Amino acid sequence: MKTPIDQLLAEHRIIEKALRALAGLCERLERGEQVDPDAFDRIFEFLMTFADRRHHQKEEKCLFPALGAQGVPRDRGPIGVILQEHCTGRALIAQMRRAVSAHANDQFIEAARAYVDLLSEHIQKEDNVLFRVAQTLLDERSMRSLQDDFNQAEAELPGSLAKYEQEAQEMERAWAV
């Protein structure tokens, strides 16, 4: 039976596809290729909707409180680090958007590369540290409650997991180098 942690791990694999697509956009710009402006809108929408509003919000509003109930502090340790990285990621997306609006390819590439690096390392921390802590601390009852919280959070958001997975695959096929 899949646990809520398994769901978060699966979402990471989807986000990694989008990160490869974003890195591919950077490589194309570095080679002097033209990139369709819609590509930027599409990747930003995916990162803001799926990675941040769907995935990060399930962590921040569901998983972290469940871990807090088990004594894991929110403001320091692994959760504190993860929260700071979520904020940094949001700031980098804003930077990328400003760079695209200003037609500043170098600034976009710098922010996008920083975002890819940040999220790649961030995912490794969650997969190998935070989620293992969760699997150790959360009993079956807590996992069921967490699953209920995830279901409620997802019901409030647009789109299905399958839709986002397809979107990430399409972007990766189109732009990853």
Functional labels for PLM-detected ranges:
Residues 1-177:
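Small-residue-biased structural context
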